[in-house]
Amino acid sequence: MNANQCAAPQTFTAAKTQPAWQRLADETDAIMRSLFDAAVSQYRPRGAVTLLAIGGYGRRELAPFSDLDIVLIHEKPRIEEAFVTALWYPLWDSGRKIGHAVRTARETYSMIKSDLDTATALVTARVVAGDERFGQKVIDRCNIKLRRQSREWLGELHTRVLERHANAGEVAYLLEPNLKDGLGGLRDIHAMWWAHAVGLGMSESDLLVLNECNEVLLRVRTALHHITGHPGDVLRLQDQRAVASEAGFVDDDELMAALAAVARRVMWISDETWARLDPPADRSARSARLAPGVALMNGEIHLADDANPATDPTLVLRVATAAARTKRRIDRDSLDRLGSVSQTWPAPWPAGASDDLVALLLEGERAIPVWEALEQRDLVSRVLPEWSAVRCKPQRNVFHRFTVDRHLWQTAANAALFAHQVTRPDLLVIAALFHDLGKGYPGDHTEVGLRLFADIGPRMGLSTDDVALVATLIEHHLLLPDVATRRDVSDDSTIAYVAQRVGNTTTLQLLYALTQADALATGPTAWGAWKAELVGTLVSRTEHVLAGNSIDSTAWRLFPDAATLEIMAQGNRHIHAHDGAITIVSPDQPGLFTAVAGVLAIHGLDVLSAEAHSNEQGIAASRFHLRAIPQNGWSEIIRDIHQAFDGGLNVDERLAERVATYSRRKRESALGPQPPEVMFHDEASSNATVVEVHAPDRIGLLRDITRVFMQQGLDIRHARIATMGDNVVDTFYLRERTGSKITGANRQRIVKEALLAELG
């Protein structure tokens, strides 16, 4: 046997009829039979010998670079080593990674009793070569022994599933999912098949769904191996477009949506299946009626005997609310009946229906698994047909950890936590559920969402005033974080701008709660202490004004503060760092801000915001707020700033070294780089011109931008830095050296052209 015949992965091409993984398994079978027959012919082993394919190979599921799991079982106590070597060496020589074992039948039966990995691997074993009758006998006896100790194995198997889930991300929501080990991935399907094989019965419909999900995951994993040319289970961002094309999807968005849908179905069936191992403690308790048509029986939520989903459309929400409130599962027969009988809701909704929806939403986190159960039977879109467009829709960026629909559920759950802080908790959770609904449709998601809610709100039976208030929340759901992170919250013009758009304290109160709920549902980077402080300050100042007070009477933290003013009065250079901020006081000269930005970039530090001020005595002060405290302390940074001011540090050279070292390590982000854009906001501040710069992120970008301002004779009064994946939105409050705003279209054009030339 030529070793190259074992190298099937190198010759893989996508199959158009038979699934590629089955075809590759069949081709491998032929190779293994040929190797086995050649070894038997040469060494003639005594007694029955069989070669079993186990694990994925046993299921005929081989991706191009899958491990080849095989076990050689012999009847006699010993088998000639040369015979075994003749089987394995051609595979090793080909570079194929194999998981192999050699055992007697008796050893195999013994291991079944003590080793879960062996036991589960043999569930899908099949004879590839050798004595087929002997091999099948071994397989059958193993299955019998497995079923005899099924309870013990099921408990251990479930424990392993839970341990893996504790360390793995969810396939449905990760930007780069692990197709095999992630929650809702292939291993979860395998675990349920094993559980079913040893006695934890599953319905035919669930098994059919798992087979369909398994095929999608295999199709993607096979394409991944083919595209990358090496083994792996993590679907990296840079490979998703090519994998989508190879696997037959329209584009990478359709691929990730399909994976989300599949993984969520697998997770739900998995949860339902394993729940039967640990039934509710009060399963035998007497049944109780919880709501019209809804009963608690055997520890689960059931449709009552008199329930009729065909004539009672709101029954589905009463069932869901009862399940969330009691933290119980919906009985599968009841859920199936709701799915098969419930109709699309009429317009307008039945009386009290919006109250039922609000009741479910106010259950908070407990409602999320219930929403997922409803989705498994396509019940959410019967309540809200517009929901279909956001179901499993991916948000492929570094901020959002969830699909659009899951993000909306989570935002509503978070909003319920703020219910006691607002006067209209009902409108808060409704706005939370619908604030991003427009993302399922073409166009600006906020504008589309407003048009959608203009139809949904009246259909729900909301009053005209309530529809208008929810619409305001949807329209401005990004207002507070955008303004807080891109504008100077100590500027009166900023406060007036927000107050004019919000209109009253009730709306501001609701918008603040929605902002927090939305950010917390987005991901860990969307709501940190810095942003929370900025938004809180903005809300506090705006609330003061909306209550009828003068903007001038509000108190806020200014820069420079009293301590910095005292240092400035001394007229000397002073650099001081505390926590995540560094303050620099120095005799004023062009380029100080730029020099500090360059030094911070050399040390790999990200700037969140910065302020600058100079007095009539020619002393300048600036303060930079950083994303994180330097790991090695401030001493080297302070030293380099002094050297940069004195001309002893070549910032350009050091930055070039850092760019050469780190830029090539940068990995692709889902957002992708956007073309540079420069915008002037003349009315955003009463005493400075606000310039907003959108650009692809790069090492030293802040320094490059501020150097252009220096060259153009502009002073920086304030800066806000926001990084979003591969892109940044930097906002600067600028003045001419004379202290005036940047006026005149020609002057602004010159500044803009200089910036765009620098940004490339």
Feature locations, PLM:
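Non-catalytic interface/linker regions that flank or bridge core catalytic/transmembrane domains
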Residues: M1-I54, R60-L62, S66-V398
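Divalent metal-dependent catalytic cores for phosphoryl transfer on phosphate-bearing substrates
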Residues: R60-F83, T403, F418-H544
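Conserved catalytic alpha/beta cores of large enzymes that bind or transform nucleotide phosphates
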Residues: R96-G99, Y109-S110, P346-S354, V358-L361, ...
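Non-catalytic interaction/regulatory segments
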Residues: R141, L235, S245, F249, ...
